[in-house]
UniProtKB/Swiss-Prot annotation:
PANTHER family: D-AMINOACYL-TRNA DEACYLASE 1, D-TYROSYL-TRNA TYR DEACYLASE. The keyword Protease does not apply. GO terms for cellular component: cytoplasm. Keywords: Cytoplasm, Hydrolase, RNA-binding, tRNA-binding. An aminoacyl-tRNA editing enzyme that deacylates mischarged D-aminoacyl-tRNAs. Also deacylates mischarged glycyl-tRNA(Ala), protecting cells against glycine mischarging by AlaRS. Acts via tRNA-based rather than protein-based catalysis; rejects L-amino acids rather than detecting D-amino acids in the active site. By recycling D-aminoacyl-tRNA to D-amino acids and free tRNA molecules, this enzyme counteracts the toxicity associated with the formation of D-aminoacyl-tRNA entities in vivo and helps enforce protein L-homochirality. Belongs to the DTD family. This is D-aminoacyl-tRNA deacylase. Its EC number is 3.1.1.96.
Length: 144
C-alpha cells in the first residue's frame, strides 16, 4: 500500500465540476492499493499517516502530526501509484489491486481515518481534478 502525502494549506477534489471533498490545513493523501495489500497493511499505513510528524512545532522543527495540529485529511484514490515503471515507456499496472479489492481497502482507510480526525475523500475510480496548495512544499512517499 502506497500513500503519497502532502502537507497542504488547502486541497479539494472535484468530479464533474462538483467539489466532492475539500480540506483546509492538513494532509492530502494520494492512495495506491497493490494486489498484496490487506487490512493489516492498511492499519499500519493509517497509523503512520496520522502520526507522521510533518508539521512544525514552536521551534520550526517537523515534530507534530496532523492530529496534534488539529488538521484534516483528504484521501484520494490513485491507482497509478502502483505502476511498474522499470521497463519501457509505458507504465504497467500489474502490481495494482483489482478494482473491487482496491475500493474496499480505500473505503476502509477513509472510514478508519475518519474515526480519529476529520476526513474527506474523492470518488473512487472517477475522473477527478485535484487542486492543492502544498505547504512547504512538504511531500513524502510512504509504502507499507
Amino acid at each position: 500500500m502506497i500513500a503519497l502525502i502532502q502537507r497542504v494549506s488547502q486541497a479539494k477534489v472535484d468530479v464533474d465540476k462538483q467539489t466532492v471533498g475539500e480540506i483546509g490545513h492538513g494532509l492530502l493523501v494520494l492512495l495506491g492499493v497493490q494486489k498484496d495489500d490487506d487490512h493489516v497493511k492498511a492499519d499500519r499505513l493509517i497509523e503512520k499517516v496520522l502520526n507522521y510528524r510533518v508539521f512544525s512545532d514552536a521551534e520550526g522543527k517537523m515534530n507534530l502530526n496532523v492530529q496534534q495540529v488539529k488538521g484534516q485529511v483528504l484521501v484520494v484514490s490513485q491507482f497509478t501509484l502502483a505502476a511498474d515503471t522499470q521497463k519501457g515507456l509505458r507504465p504497467s499496472f500489474s502490481r495494482g489491486a483489482s478494482p473491487d479489492m482496491a475500493e474496499a481497502l480505500y473505503d476502509y482507510v477513509v472510514k478508519k481515518c475518519g474515526e480519529k480526525i476529520p476526513t474527506f475523500s474523492g470518488q473512487f475510480a472517477a475522473d477527478m481534478q485535484v487542486s492543492l496548495t502544498n505547504d512547504g512544499p512538504v511531500t513524502f512517499w510512504l509504502e507499507i
